[in-house]
Amino acid sequence: MLTIHTGSQEPPLAVAVDGERIVALGSPDEVAAAYPTARVRRWRGRLGPGLLHEGPLPEAPSARERVHALLRLGATGARAEHLTDPALRAAAQRNNLAVLDRPPSLERGARADLAVFAEDGSCVATVLAGRLVHRRA
């Protein structure tokens, strides 16, 4: 489903996502005009690329919960050296957490890995491969 994500930052930014890929970036007005039938998600916070988690994953009772802890932080990728445990790597794959060696970027054609951050730096929402995987209540 085609979805446009917008943040509340200045200058305004909108990212159009179709499936798991970014199809357009620009001002909310430009992107909405290009995709008038798209669903629009308006987020309160700064929309940008997800974070690359540089260190070991947070401790939690299960591998799934360790990966989910990253999603709550706005991380959309982790380094391979921190995913060597088979259960942890499997949980990362099931959740589409990217294994990266550099921070993700927002560009047309790239995988839609986005995050929205509030003014205090806390994560409002995380999108992995076009799918909303975390939303703060």
Regions found by a protein language model. Give the residues of each.
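Active-site loop-helix segments enriched in His/Asp/Glu that coordinate
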Residues: 80-105
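Short, compositionally biased
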Residues: 38-40, 125-132
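Hydrophobic residues within beta-strands of alpha/beta enzymes
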Residues: 78-79, 115
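N-terminal metal-binding scaffold of metallo-dependent hydrolase/deaminase domains
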Residues: 1-34, 99, 105-106, 110-119, ...
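Alpha-helical segments flanking ligand/cofactor-binding loops in enzyme cores
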Residues: 68-71, 107
